[in-house]
Amino acid sequence: MEWSEVEVHTTNEAVEPVANVLTEFGAAGVSIEDVADFLREREDKFGEIYALRREDYPEDGVIIKAYFLKTTEFVEQIPEIEQTLKNLSTFDIPLGKFQFVVNDVDDEEWATAWKKYYHPVQITDRITIVPSWESYTPSANEIIIELDPGMAFGTGTHPTTQLCIRALSNYLQPGDEVIDVGTGSGVLSIASAKLGAKSILATDLDEIATRAAEENITLNKTEHIITVKQNNLLQDINKTNVDIVVANILAEVILLFPEDVYKALKPGGVFIASGIIEDKAKVVEEALKNAGLIIEKMEQQGDWVAIISKRGVE
């Protein structure tokens, strides 16, 4: 089989949206490369850094590589893929010195390249995300989330995902009922389950995402707690008295359903909203207030913001 590699040079802030677009167009695997990844890859057990050629790694920003079967359909889609990526800037996602290149690669290269740069990531002092193929020995009481990030959704390395997991660690109580809107890889649902949630509904409009979530949920043996549903936000979800709703999606999407979140939450229930670029935080904050939610806290990592709000106790 012949394969094509799509290489996109962009910013750290754009990593997850770009990776999601590439996956939606049918990428079989995605790798993310930055300076820190290359340095870590070449560090041996004694801490020595091997010499790197300047051309071996990006000078700034990030290089995202996605691998596609080289079919007639894919070749015809190339201009559409490039334009869809460029259109992300209309959502105020900074693309930086955007570059889009397509190369041919062999079978072996595409099958392993994307795995090389994904390593265990410690999110909190209790929670670590580990790629499914790596051997990792947890410390006492450490919570391990195994992920296969081949589908490119929410690997845990993106600031928005980390902000959500930290908020879940702070607010989720054992026995809580959770709704995860826009679940992607299922990482937030899995984190909720391992933190002690009683039941979790994970929704996503994208069929590829729901399949990826189901696979990761099974990998983590949490399928008895988590139900995955292909669904548009909270539309036709008739749950009420939910303890926590969590959504790691773009600000423009969060603005579509704060009233539905309010209806779903029990009095005192918590809404964790991330995926919000700093410039959009005020708009989202006002929308949540207008829906009747009370702003509890705002957390920031880089240019990304998470807003934690609550339904008032009536």
UniProtKB/Swiss-Prot annotation:
Q: Which GO terms describe its biological process?
A: methylation
Spell out the CDD domains in the cross-references.
AdoMet_MTases
Q: Which residues participate in S-adenosyl-L-methionine binding?
A: 161, 182, 204, 248
Gene Ontology molecular function, alphabetical: protein methyltransferase activity; protein-lysine N-methyltransferase activity
Stretches of the chain forming a coiled coil according to its record: none
CC terms in the record's Gene Ontology section: cytoplasm
Name the InterPro entries on file. Answer: Ribosomal_L11_MeTrfase_PrmA, Ribosomal_PrmA_MeTrfase, SAM-dependent_MTases_sf
Q: Which reaction does it catalyse?
A: L-lysyl-[protein] + 3 S-adenosyl-L-methionine = N(6),N(6),N(6)-trimethyl-L-lysyl-[protein] + 3 S-adenosyl-L-homocysteine + 3 H(+)
Its EC number(s): 2.1.1.-
Compartments it resides in: Cytoplasm
What's one Pfam family here? PrmA
Major location, coarse class? Answer: cytoplasm
Q: What class of enzyme is it?
A: transferase
Top-level taxon: Bacteria
UniProtKB keywords = Cytoplasm, Methyltransferase, S-adenosyl-L-methionine, Transferase
Function noted in UniProt:
Methylates ribosomal protein L11.
What family is this protein classified in? Belongs to the methyltransferase superfamily. PrmA family.
HAMAP family recorded: Methyltr_PrmA (MF_00735)
For this entry, the protein name equals Ribosomal protein L11 methyltransferase
Gene source species:
Listeria monocytogenes serovar 1/2a (strain ATCC BAA-679 / EGD-e)
Gene encoding it?
prmA
